[in-house]
Amino acid sequence: MPKRNTKELSSDLRDELLGALRARFAKNMNRHKGVEWDKIEAKLKASADKLWSLNEMETTGGEPDVVGHDKKTNEYIFYDCSAESPKERRSLCYDRAALDSRKEHKPKDSAIDVAAAMGVEILTEEQYRELQKLGKFDLKTSSWIATPSDIRKLGGALFCDRRYDTVFTYHNGAESYYAARGFRGMLKV
């Protein structure tokens, strides 16, 4: 008997996820003007691994939604669009090196490792700022963002939030973790 791909949803779960994504898409048309749901759904149905990743985004509180369409590659771009940093992805340090450097009081995991396991990428600063043009996010929380290697080599990592109606980018030690800091993911389909 062939081994079943563990990154594939049951038909019931797939239909439930597609329904949630469709409803969110229809409710937030300002995020994706000129994009048609039927084309996205057809691509999703043909991409079991992408659906699995979107389900990971959904079940961890990310509320993924379409935020763009790359006409060159014909890929639809999903970001986590939850009002606050996804609840089930908080209290994480930045990456594996930061996690391994902690001697005690280690967090359960790192943002980079969790994102990789989910099959998504952490938003860059540019992507985070694009997201903030679509609404007001992270008013009470903050989100790790992809950190340039020169900053990371020196032990730092970057995160963003929105306060005083302004998007801020900050630095912190990569090994730090907070109950109000998570990460937002990006997936291309």
Regions found by a protein language model. Give the residues of each.
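A binding-site-centric feature that preferentially detects glycan-recognition modules on secreted/surface proteins
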Residues: 2-121, 125-189
